[in-house]
């Protein structure tokens, strides 16, 4: 099989997989029963699996990945976090620049561990930013957003809410997009 054909098939497979995953998580988030398994999750392992899933597209676009994570762990549901990270990586790919870059880092505060995922893509216009987590919102209808469904970041927000995580986004137009996930620090109950 020729490399261009293989790349096209990888793209189609990835799109189908993402669409099915979104549908399943949409149904899961609407369900009255949840099967989350909260435990300590190694962020590098979790992120590595997500990047592996998107490897063909990341390689095709020649993404530079800057992973500044150490051996970070967070307490959350692994599948939920992987879904969130997958949607964020997918958006970085869809709205990438000519020399795409994805930077992942973490800072620690007294109240939360803060994961930052930042790309250097087209970003979101300032007047659209307050609405990016709303269902169906696709923002400015430029050519790059014509295929947008407005469901990805909505589902990321819903999953974050279910997992008791806080999200923030920043995006100077045409200078990238940054999404920040706040993992609250659990208070010790003194062994009780």
Question: Where are these predicted regions, by residue range?
Answer:
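Conserved micro-motifs of the catalytic ATP-binding
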Residues: 31-36, 69, 73-79
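Short conserved segments within the C-terminal catalytic ATPase subdomain
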Residues: 57-66
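Short helix-loop "hinge" at the ATP-lid/N-box region of the Bergerat-fold HATPase_c
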Residues: 92-93
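Short beta-strand/loop element within the Bergerat-fold HATPase_c
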Residues: 99-111
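Acidic ATP/Mg2+-coordinating residue in the GHKL
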Residues: 119
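Short conserved segment of the HATPase_c
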Residues: 124-137
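Conserved glycine-rich
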Residues: 165-169
